[in-house]
C-alpha cells in the first residue's frame, strides 16, 4: 500500500508529489500522459503580479517551481519597479517544453515517487475515510491518503465557434469521465467553470518593425532563494501591440457564432482574464486593447498572443489577428478555444486542503475553482505537506493571511463564494507590505525546514540574513553622519542641509536619500555596517525596513489583531442551530462553511459582526 496517491501531474500534482516524497513517504503519481508533466497549457510564463510572490513563497517552503523557472526561463522581468516594494512582482517567460522536461526529470529522479500512466475514474471511502482510487482498467489502488489535482480535465468540453467536443486541456487531450460522479456519490457538491486560451501564431509572420519590443531585465532577480543567478538571462524579447476599431468590428461579426454569446458555454469564466470578445462587449467605448506577443520557447516558432483569448470561429480569429498592427501577415498555428470543466466548491475543504466529506482526501488546484499555475502549485505543495503530517500524526500546517499570499489564497477559497475561476492579486492581501516577494524566505523558510523540505544549509543562510539585518538596523539607529560628509549630496538633491550630525536612520527616511547614498558618503557608517556593502539581500531588507518603518508597524498591528481572532478555534462539530440569536443567513453560511476559527467566520460573506460576537460569547471568548 502506498502512503499517498497523487492524481494528476500538472503544477499542483508535481508539487504535491515532491512534498510527499521529500517528506519521507512513498508516493504514487498517476497521470494520463507522462509526456505532459507540468505542461503549460496556457501562457508560457511563471510569476507576475501576486503570482511572483506566490512562486517565491513556494520556493521558500521548499517547493520546486522557483528552481524550475530559474533553469528554464528565457526572459526575466521585475514588474512594477516604479511602485513601492509591496507591488514588485517577478515574472519570467518560460521555454514551456524545457520547463515540462525539467519537472519530469525532477519527479522521475525522486526515489520515493512511483509513476503510473493511467486515468483515475473513481474514489472509494470506508466510513468517511479515503481508501482507494480506481483507474480506467478497473484496478483499485489503495493508499493511506490521496491528493486530487485534476486540472480542467473533469468532464472537459472544448468550444471553438459553434463546434464543441470533449477535451481535457487541449484539443489533443481527452477529458476524465466518471470521477466527478464518483465524488458526487461521496457527498461532494460540484459546479461548472470556464477558461480559455488565445491562438498561437508563427513568430516568423510578425512584422517586428511595427510592434514595440519589451526586453527583459539586464540583471534579473532569480525566483529561487537558492539560486545565485538564472540559467538564461535574456534569450528572447516580448512585443507589444494593440487591437484597433477594425479588429473589434471584425470580431463582432462572429458574435452570432460565439459559444459565449449564444449560450453554448454554461460555465462561468474568469472576470480578470476575459476573452477578447468579452472585453469588446463589456467595454464598447474602448477603442483598443493591449496585445502581448510572447515566444513559447527557443526551439519553436510558436508565439502566444496574450490578451486575445477567444472561442470565436477560426475564420473570425485569423481575420481579427490580421487587423492588428504588426500581425497583418500572421499565420495561425493553433486556434484559441474555451474549455468548460467541473470543479468542487472549495467550502468543502479545510484550511489544510483536506476535504470535509472524506478524511485523508485532499484537493489541490483547479478542482478547487482556482486559475493559474502558481495558485495550483501552492495548493499542491500545502496538500502534500499536510498529507504527510496527517499520516505521521503531526500538527497540520495552516498559513495565516499575515504569513503568506498562499494563506490568503486558501482562506479566500474557503470563506468566499467561488462563482468564477479565482486568481490572486496583490489587492487580495490586506498585509501585502509584509508579504513582499523579497522576504518570502525570511517568513517561511523555518516552516519548510520543519516539513523536511528545506536543507539546514538554506535555513542557516536565512537565519544569518535575519541576524545581519537586525544588526545593521541597530547600527543605522546610532551611527551619525556629519554635515561635511553629506551636505554636498543634500544640496545637489535640493534637500535641506545638516547643521549638526544626524542619525543615518533619519537621513535614509528622507525622500530622495537611499541607503546606498549614506554608505557611499559616510566612512563611519560604512565601517560599522560592512555587511551592507557585501550582501545586497541585507542592504535591500534594511532599506525597506527603514523607509517603510511606520507603514510596516501599522500593518503589523492590524495583522496581530486579526491573528488573535484566527487563534480562537471553533470546534468542528459546533452546533450552530443552538444559537437562536444568529441571523438566518449567518447560520446558513456558518453551517455551510464550518469555519475553523472566529477570524475565518468573520470573513464569510453573510456572517455579520453581530453573528461573530454571539459566537465569541458562546465560546467564552
From Swiss-Prot:
Residues that hold FAD according to the record: 8-13, 120, 366
Binding residues annotated for NAD(+), in chain numbering: 269-283
Coiled-coil blocks: none
An MF annotation (GO) of this entry: flavin adenine dinucleotide binding
GO cellular component: cytosol
Subcellular location: Cytoplasm
Function field: NAD-binding protein involved in the addition of a carboxymethylaminomethyl (cmnm) group at the wobble position (U34) of certain tRNAs, forming tRNA-cmnm(5)s(2)U34.
Family classification: Belongs to the MnmG family.
Name of the molecule in the record: tRNA uridine 5-carboxymethylaminomethyl modification enzyme MnmG
